[in-house]
Amino acid sequence: MEIVNKQSFQEVLEYVRMYRLKNRIKRDMEDNNRKIRDNQKRILLLDNLNQYIRDDMTIAEVRGIIESMRDDYESRVDDYTIRNAELSKQRREASTKMKEQKKAHAELLKNAEK
């Protein structure tokens, strides 16, 4: 019985660890979503700004700078999207492990009662 309790305690610790990991991943994904949204707003801002700037109003290099900034923001959006996909995969894996562990623990308790 003591072996079952020790194993059960270890499983509970592992379950808590997985639950915390899952929550951390969820927070990271929400943070990435905010970053994606912010950078998409910046892209829109730069697009609008680019419509108002005329060659006779300012130096042509300004357009190059704006385009460079826009490309940078688009790259960031892509990077965050990829990171979100990776985090989502980790979260699904953690959920699967937690379900398996919960099922195994239930079976262990069921067998211990016999």
Swiss-Prot record:
The record's section on Pfam families has: DUF496
Q: Where is this region: Disordered?
A: 89-114
Q: Which InterPro entries match?
A: DUF496
Reply yes or no: does the keyword Transcription regulation apply: no
Q: Which cell locations does it reside in?
A: Cytoplasm
**Which residues, by range, are in coiled-coil regions?**
70-111
Instruction: Give the UniProt entry's GO cellular component terms.
Output: cytosol
**Which family would the database say this protein is a member of?**
Belongs to the pole-localizer TmaR family.
Xref: HAMAP family: Pole_loc_TmaR (MF_00683)
Q: What does this protein do?
A: Pole-localizer protein involved in the regulation of several cellular processes.
UniProt-recorded name of the protein: Pole-localizer protein TmaR
- Write down the species: Haemophilus influenzae (strain 86-028NP)
User: Source gene?
Assistant: tmaR
